[in-house]
Amino acid sequence: GNGSGSGSGMDSGIQESRLQSFTASSDLKDIHFKFDQYDLDDNSRAVLQKNAEYLKNNPNLHVEVQGHCDERGTNNYNIALGERRAHSTKKYLVAQGVNSRNVHVISYGEEKPFCFSSGEVCWQENRRAHFMVSK
């Protein structure tokens, strides 16, 4: 196909996200969360404002917001928490003027850690929203 379809069905955003190939972008910075939290602090909002400007200046980019957690808690709990982190991140980007159709969310819970040690320093690195892009 030519990629011009608009998707269909209630879950089209999820399906579209899985069909697209997302890659890392050095232009979009991760944000981090406190333990068991998904609300955005001032540092996160400042980073997201810069990410939003980049996305608005590149309107053809699609971004996948990946919610991640540390290893504490059950798998199911962390998948749900990661999803809340990704959604709160998307909500903020959209409030800054990013096209909501270009922002896709997914949760990896504790499945894709950035840091593999145990302990607060490492856990802090793993409690994050990570950004991948697709044209």
Which sequence ranges carry the predicted segments?
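Periplasmic peptidoglycan-binding/tethering modules of Gram-negative envelope proteins
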Residues: 1-62
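A broad, low-specificity signal for short, low-complexity segments enriched in glycine/proline
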Residues: 23-27, 64-67, 91-94
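Periplasmic OmpA-like peptidoglycan-binding domain that tethers envelope proteins to the cell wall
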Residues: 68-135
